[in-house]
Amino acid sequence: PSDMVDLIKSIKSASALTDHTVQIVTDGPNPILLNQLTQIFVMSEDWAKANGCEVSYNWDAGETSYCASNANGTGPFKITFREQDVRTVFEKNNDWWGDDSTFNVDTIELLPIANDATRVAALLSGEIDYTNVVPVQDIERIKSSAGHGVKMTPQNRTIFFGMDQGSAELNSSNIKGKNPFADKRVRLAMYHALDMEAIKDKVMRGQSVPAGIITAPGVNGHTAARDERLPYDPELSKKLLAEAGYPDGFEVTLDCPNDRYINDEAICVAAIGMFAKIGVDVTLDAKTKSQHFSEVKEGDANGMTSDMYMLGWGVPTFDSHYVYSYLFDSAGSWNKVNFSNARVDELVAAMGVETDQDKRNAMIAEAWDITQDDVTYLPLHHQVVNQASKSNVDVPIRMNNEPLFRFANVN
């Protein structure tokens, strides 16, 4: 199924009542329908049918369709040229229905530059005007460059590790016949082994916010109290491992992307060193994001699933139900830790239909109580968004790191 299915599965039908009124019928109450609809974009029915775009395709398997590479819409810019992974050109749409007084840009050229050093050099040399992918190690250099500036804001994305707690045995471990991660004491030991302040200072150059919960500030259900990390305490970790029956630790492989999150592989390397201090021998398997996510979600070519992995999660609906439906529900499409709790499943279903906000918030709080106590995931940090540009270029920074060029101005 499409990755969008969880956002629209409550919708039974949609019809146009007038030129400017759409009626949506759901299969029951949906308290976050409006939040979900912010992620759904309207396509022309005639265009979609004419180009065979009615059936979803499997992006993870490399499938594509006409509508994945051809524009259809009524936005402020038109695509006039596209060479995938090389160059895309947008021109102002003079027939746009919206207010064009918010921007003065006529042409945008998108140039994907994968290499960090090359991208920064292109900015400082004047080859490009703006980038929303800024290496943390280059922030001060860009700031000190005449004619350039850097903007920062907390991002709606939390980075964490997942541990398979549901399988009878880990694929990569030297422990056979049982699963160390099935024991909460082991998961807790892994948590206490992580010094996120050290990772913030040494790996992230201060550009991260250590997290105690796997959802970002601003999301319904997040609280400052829940975001307080448990203390870094490797001695307690060793004690917990011994109590769980692993005084000498164990071996496991950590799957990590090397081109998706800010300093993702470096974070994994640092964490592996910390796990080693408590006797857990972790082997790094770092790979490109396309391969990483495919193998975490579907298994590798041999059908082997990941024992431990890095994942980042943003919440476009700004509501915890989005987190729970994907990551904690027993049937969640990204619940690759194989967590299953009947009460949490009940709460996920209930918070999806409860319209009394106080009752719903209580359900969300109970779900977080259960899963934080379970140590289902190891929260690492909330990312920080950095964007850099020439001083005369103003692109408002957004916490989802998706720039809206209809608010961009060049002075």
What are the language-model segments listed below?
Residues I128-D129, S145-V150, L254, I267, ...:
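Periplasmic binding protein-like
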Residues K184-L188, H192, K200, I278-K297, ...:
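Extracytoplasmic/peripheral linker and loop segments enriched in polar/acidic and small residues
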Residues Q36, I175-V219, N263-I267, T371-P379:
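Periplasmic-binding protein-like
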Residues Q39-F103, T107-E109, E235, K239:
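Gly/Pro-rich hinge or "lid" segments in bacterial periplasmic/extracellular proteins
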Residues S65, D95-R141, D281:
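Ligand-site clamp/hinge motif
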Residues D3-S56:
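Surface-exposed binding/hinge segments that line
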Residues F77, H192, V209-E243, R260-E265:
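Structural transition elements
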Residues Q387-N411:
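Long beta-strand-rich cores associated with HINT superfamily self-processing modules
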